[in-house]
Amino acid sequence: MRKAKPKKRVILPDPVFNDQKVSKFVNHLMYDGKKNASYEIFYAALETVKAKLPNEEKSALEIWKKALDNVTPQVEVKSRRVGGATFQVPTEIRPDRKESVSMKNLILFARKRGGKSMADKLAAEIMDAFNEQGGAYKRKEDMHRMAEANRAFAHFRF
């Protein structure tokens, strides 16, 4: 066991929207310390989203936040050994982990899309998530389905 819980680092808000969530997302998107490239990709993706959904009364940032909410899981399954058998125990997810998992899934499935630039792939995944479709949304649904199927083992909580 560790002595003390590590302090949470303060993440500075992004320069355009002044939002910490955007900064966190860009940090997940970043490769090799290239944060400016990540910001460019993210902002280009939001521009594309706004261009593709012109009749939507929400701003591109609000669409992105709604898409994130749509792919945020509420429960997950964790493996737990009990008497030689391994059970998939459904557990609720901490709020900070919910946010992190949803961002990582959105980025992962955007990267898996074929062809085009990363900005286009991210924009497509954001629009799919906004419309409750796409890989990231499917991953959330699968997590919930697994938790529901293993509900009988919920009394093995950690």
Swiss-Prot record:
GO biological process: ribosomal small subunit assembly; translation
GO MF annotation: an example: rRNA binding
UniProt entry keywords in alphabetical sequence: Ribonucleoprotein, Ribosomal protein, RNA-binding, rRNA-binding, tRNA-binding
A Gene Ontology term for the protein's cellular component: cytosolic small ribosomal subunit
Keyword Iron-sulfur: no
Domain of life: Bacteria
SUPFAM superfamilies: Ribosomal protein S7
InterPro entries documented for this protein: Ribosomal_uS7 (IPR000235), Ribosomal_uS7_bac/org-type (IPR005717), Ribosomal_uS7_dom (IPR023798), Ribosomal_uS7_dom_sf (IPR036823)
Pfam families: Ribosomal_S7
Function per UniProt: One of the primary rRNA binding proteins, it binds directly to 16S rRNA where it nucleates assembly of the head domain of the 30S subunit. Is located at the subunit interface close to the decoding center, probably blocks exit of the E-site tRNA.
Subunit structure as annotated in this protein's UniProt entry: Part of the 30S ribosomal subunit. Contacts proteins S9 and S11.
PANTHER family: RIBOSOMAL PROTEIN S7
Family named by the database record: Belongs to the universal ribosomal protein uS7 family.
Protein name: Small ribosomal subunit protein uS7
Organism, as annotated: Bacteroides thetaiotaomicron (strain ATCC 29148 / DSM 2079 / JCM 5827 / CCUG 10774 / NCTC 10582 / VPI-5482 / E50)
